[in-house]
Regions:
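Aliphatic-rich helix starts adjacent to a transmembrane/signal segment
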Residues: 2-4, 8-62, 66
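Generic beta-structure capping elements
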Residues: 36, 115-117, 154
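Short regulatory "switch" loops immediately downstream of catalytic or recognition motifs
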Residues: 69-73, 157
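Type IV pilin-like appendage domain
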Residues: 72-143
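Short linear sequence signals and composition-biased patches located at protein termini or domain-edge surfaces
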Residues: 121, 128-179
Length: 179
């Protein structure tokens, strides 16, 4: 007369554990993708800033070196256009010798710096980056030839994890012939 029907609807413990496992895997994968995207964005932003800083420094040095004058008095570069003190230190007479006098670019403590007669030493690149290599090479500074300066610079970001690194080289000759 009475039929007992099983009207208990629900999940078994195994079904619940399987669904929690699948949900955890999906959330873990989504979190991993999000964290990877943030790391990639941070790396890209650092790389863009590195390009900006390096480009500014190279343009600044190129303009100053291109506009340099021959040191006819011999006070700055011993009568030459450029004087390489060591491979990471260049000295020359500024285009406006009255205002700036002798100008220098050099590497000091992993920072690219500039100095002239009338100003203190100033950094050209943000302290968030370190210059791992700076080399100046002068060719053709003998009498009768137009001098050229080749600059090689390697800059790297400072921070935890993988940081971008940039190597750049350029060659500059003086704008005004003074041979």
């Amino acid at each position: 007369m009475f039929k007992f029907l099983n009207k208990n609807k629900g999940f078994t413990l195994v079904e619940m554990l399987v669904s929690i496992l699948i949900f955890s895997i999906i959330i873990g994968a989504a979190t991993g993708v999000f964290v990877s995207a943030i790391k990639l964005q941070r790396y890209s932003l650092t790389h863009q800033q590195l390009l900006d800083q390096t480009s500014y420094a190279m343009e600044y040095m190129s303009r100053a070196i291109r506009m340099a004058q021959k040191d006819t008095a011999g006070d700055c570069t011993d009568g030459k256009n450029y004087k390489v003190i060591d491979e990471n230190h260049l000295k020359f007479m500024s285009y406006n010798s009255v205002l700036y006098g002798c100008q220098e670019f050099f590497l000091e403590g992993n920072q690219l710096k500039t100095k002239n007669d009338n100003l203190s030493t100033l950094p050209l690149i943000s302290p968030n980056f370190r210059v791992t290599s700076l080399k100046f090479s002068v060719s053709g500074d003998e009498s009768g030839k137009q001098p050229r300066v080749t600059i090689f610079m390697e800059v790297q970001g400072i921070g935890v994890g993988s940081q971008p690194r940039l190597r750049i080289q350029t060659t500059i000759s003086q704008r005004n012939l003074n041979i």
